[in-house]
Regions:
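Sec-dependent N-terminal signal peptides
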Residues: 7-15
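Acidic (Asp/Glu) and glycine-rich low-complexity loops/linkers
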Residues: 2-8, 22-120, 124-139, 150-159, ...
Length: 255
């Protein structure tokens, strides 16, 4: 009886390896296709699941999906209100492997304006060029990554819930509010910001570097995480409870 159980376990392990190999080969050797989706009139982007989205601000609307054919077919793009919604239709096979650059799926998006980025899950949002808008809301819930090179706006709201990362390499804004709940990380580089409010609840980290013409920063820390401030501001205040730290060793305050 025990011998039969061992044999059955061995067969199941071999089948699992074979299934994984088949799915892996499907992603690696499958034909790469490019598909254009006809969607217009959006000013927000919502990503649900694991897609990677590359955004560029432009005069026109465009949505292009590129990757292995079965994965392209697995991506749904649709308009809901003011938002372009990008999501996975479902898993491909039992294991969804992507090996190497040739096996990766990417959704390329352009629009004249962008006022909201919402990422729910483990996907990625990447913008390598300037986004020029009046107000932008950037929200991440999950383990994904949002990486924005350059933003110029009047107001910027940043919210992270979970273990993901938000990196804003350059933000030129009058008003910025950033909130982190969980174990994730927010990294900000600010220019010309009159009011900055940073709130952390949990074990994550917020890093903010203040460059030219930044005025006031308010920090609220609840938990074991850290807020690390660098650069120069005119006013600084903090509220703290828990074992975390608000580091100001590299912050200069000059009223």
């Amino acid at each position: 009886m025990r011998k039969s159980q061992f044999v059955m376990v061995g067969v199941m392990m071999v089948m699992a390896v074979m299934t994984t190999s088949c799915v892996t080969r499907q992603s690696v050797f499958e034909k790469t296709v490019t598909e254009t989706r006809q969607i217009k009139g959006f000013e927000e982007i919502e990503i649900n699941g694991s897609p990677t989205v590359c955004y560029t601000q432009a005069d026109n609307f465009s949505v292009t999906v590129k990757g292995p054919e079965s994965q392209v077919e697995n991506i749904i793009t649709e308009k809901s209100g003011k938002a372009l919604v990008i999501r996975n239709k479902g898993k491909i096979g039992f294991v969804n492997f992507q090996l190497g650059d040739e096996g990766e799926l990417t959704v390329y998006v352009t629009s004249p304006d962008l006022t909201g980025i919402r990422l729910n899950g483990s996907g990625d949002f990447i913008s390598d060029r300037r986004i020029d808008t009046d107000k932008i809301d950037i929200m991440l819930r999950g383990s994904g990554d949002i990486d924005v090179k350059d933003v110029i706006c009047d107001r910027c709201n940043v919210e992270l819930i979970g273990s993901g990362d938000i990196d804003l390499d350059r933000v030129d804004t009058q008003d910025l509010s950033a909130s982190l709940i969980g174990s994730g990380d927010i990294d900000l580089h600010l220019w010309n910001t009159a009011d900055t409010r940073l709130a952390l609840k949990g074990s994550g980290d917020i890093k903010a570097t203040f460059h030219d013409n930044c005025d006031a920063v308010e920090c609220e820390l609840r938990g074991s995480g850290d807020i690390d401030l660098k650069g120069e501001v005119k006013h600084f205040s903090k509220e703290k409870s828990g074992s975390g730290d608000v580091s100001v060793g590299q912050l200069t305050v000059r009223p």
